[in-house]
Amino acid sequence: MRIVVCDDEPLARERLVRIVKESGHEVVAQAKTGIEAIIAVKSEQPDIILLDIRMPEMDGVECAQELATLSHPPAIIFVTAYDHYAIAALKANAIGYLLKPANKDELLEALKKATNLNAAQLNEIRKLEDPTARPVREHIVARTHR
């Protein structure tokens, strides 16, 4: 999976990058702010973004809301020191919310969940884009024999 890591704390960002790389995923970009993260996502089109919440310029929740407007948004996993943003994160369509320092196993489980989710989404998109696919009949009405 292609991953963007966004955290304004260099040590936290480096730790996440190391765990991601050790797990066999590719870090395609690193960002220090929400604005940098949006730019990175638009240019790199990652599958997943690991996103801090409290950052300068634009916080992670605002960034996630902006990313959700993209035609192919990445799966969002928040990695933050603040647990009181969990509801806002879920409203921003996050699929994961981990507290710092992120436990390696929890992070890997969140990445696995995001990978599975993205695979399912890709299959649905391919079905929709397949010109040979039969049209879906959503409202079929039929008589029953009694």
Give, region by region, the residue ranges found by the protein language model.
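Conserved binding/recognition cores within well-folded domains
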Residues: 112, 116-146
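Conserved sequence signature across two-component system core domains
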Residues: 6-7, 31, 49, 80
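Acidic catalytic/metal-coordinating carboxylates
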Residues: 33-36, 59-62
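A Lys-centered signature of the CheY-like receiver
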Residues: 100
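Two-component/phosphorelay signaling modules centered on CheY-like receiver
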Residues: 10-29
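Receiver (REC) domain active-site loop signature in two-component systems and cognate sites
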Residues: 53-55
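Active-site beta3 strand of CheY-like receiver
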Residues: 44-50
